């Protein structure tokens, strides 16, 4: 009788501990938020692939990225075409040397429709727009709005908060795959997030 009681008690304790652990485990949303908050910023090289819905590589690219939280980023593409995207937290500049044009937007205006902004800021309300799941170091974000035109957004970030890359999966099945290398943690200098319009360049100001 004592053996049976001990076995039952042990089983009950195991079940209780398992339930307690599961109940207190961080949700995927909380875990992703925690990892993103571990580092104030980083810089890295990136490589890019665009894969068609049929599985063919239709474009490849490379460049550098610099991020400082909250809301500062510099995205410089060096191949196949040179262009630059810079945000100081309020204004966003998109510069294309080839066509000698700078387009200017309010950052909110340009980024409110993309989860890329989650890599650059830590705003609680952002997370309400997505259903988040986790598989290892990969977090998948799916928009909750029924009428959303966004597809899925996947972030690869390790337990130390180092972002390894991200994927954008459109609703039609096209994929944009971005992989980071030579990641350096720490906030880049503030002057990396400012932009001066070069002389002779056409300005397309979309702020309203």
From Swiss-Prot:
Cellular-component GO terms for this entry: outer membrane-bounded periplasmic space
Signal peptide: 1-25
SUPFAM superfamilies xrefs: Prokaryotic lipoproteins and lipoprotein localization factors (SSF89392)
Top-level taxon in the UniProt lineage: Bacteria
Keyword Zinc-finger part of the UniProt annotation: no
GO biological process entries: lipoprotein localization to outer membrane; lipoprotein transport
Alphabetically ordered keywords of this record: Chaperone, Periplasm, Protein transport, Signal, Transport
InterPro entries documented for this protein: LolA/LolB/LppX (IPR029046), OM_lipoprot_carrier_LolA-like (IPR004564), OM_lipoprot_carrier_LolA_Pbac (IPR018323)
Subcellular location field: Periplasm
HAMAP family named in the record: LolA
Protein family per UniProt: Belongs to the LolA family.
Known role: Participates in the translocation of lipoproteins from the inner membrane to the outer membrane. Only forms a complex with a lipoprotein if the residue after the N-terminal Cys is not an aspartate (The Asp acts as a targeting signal to indicate that the lipoprotein should stay in the inner membrane).
Quaternary structure (record): Monomer.
Name under which the protein is recorded: Outer-membrane lipoprotein carrier protein
